[in-house]
């Protein structure tokens, strides 16, 4: 299956080496893989692998600039799943076959599946949850090869941690924290152009 996927990706890349034209709509299908830096489980693991699949629908205003809106589903190895919805701006720097680009995104991430766990410490029992929800931003840079984009990026996601429990005397307690944490990712996208 991996070989078939790699072969299909290679054929799509090689079969579409032509420059984008202004005045077209673009649908960008993408896949990302990276790591999120946060201690989600209080288990001293600060690095959590994540994968993402998504799409951006936009308009190519010039040979260099496209603007759009998009969403992707992101999941960490700890099964925290979230859906960032964002506005996107992409700028390609020249008109050659290999075109450097930079892309910026800003939006809101909705939690689809949080991470919950139970525990006890020093006579206290507690239930905790970690949600990736709130502010979302990302910046990526790389090169476009025809319709294919390859790059490296960094994203910032709002991590909301909520903990509640009961102390040894049976009294309830609650703790909440909110942090914006970074992640780095490898970016692969294939662009479909239409409307002209």
Residue ranges of each PLM-predicted region?
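Bacterial Sec-dependent N-terminal signal peptides
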Residues: 1-25, 192-196
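Short sequence motifs at beta-strands and strand-loop junctions characteristic
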Residues: 21, 45-49, 79-81, 129-135, ...
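Gram-negative (and chloroplast) outer-membrane scaffold detector with strong preference
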Residues: 24, 33-35, 56-122, 129-147, ...
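N-terminal targeting signals for Sec/Tat export/insertion, comprising classic cleavable signal peptides
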Residues: 28-56
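Extracellular loop and loop/strand-boundary signature of outer-membrane beta-barrel proteins
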Residues: 39-43, 73-75, 120-129, 170-178
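Flexible, surface-exposed loop regions and adjacent strand-edge segments
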Residues: 48, 85-86, 118-124, 165-173
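C-terminal beta-signal and adjacent terminal beta-strands/loops
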Residues: 152, 156-163
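Outer-membrane beta-barrel proteins, especially TonB-dependent receptors
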Residues: 161-187
């Amino acid at each position: 299956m991996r070989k078939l996927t790699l072969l299909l990706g290679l054929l799509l890349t090689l079969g579409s080496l032509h420059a984008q034209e202004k005045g077209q709509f673009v649908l960008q299908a993408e896949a990302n893989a990276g790591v999120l830096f946060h201690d989600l489980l209080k288990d001293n693991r600060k690095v959590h692998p994540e994968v993402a699949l998504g799409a951006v629908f936009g308009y190519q205003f010039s040979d260099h600039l496209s603007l759009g809106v998009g969403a992707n589903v992101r999941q960490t190895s700890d099964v925290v799943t979230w859906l960032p919805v964002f506005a996107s701006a992409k700028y390609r720097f020249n008109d050659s076959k290999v075109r450097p680009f930079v892309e910026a995104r800003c939006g809101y991430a909705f939690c689809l599946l949080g991470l919950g766990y139970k525990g006890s410490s020093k006579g206290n029992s507690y239930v905790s949850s970690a949600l990736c929800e709130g502010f979302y931003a990302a910046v990526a840079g790389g090169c476009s090869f025809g319709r294919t984009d390859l790059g490296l990026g960094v994203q910032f996601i709002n991590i909301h941690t909520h903990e509640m429990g009961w102390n040894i005397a049976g009294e309830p307690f609650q703790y909440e924290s909110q942090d914006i944490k970074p992640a780095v990712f490898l970016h692969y996208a294939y662009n479909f152009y239409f409307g002209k």
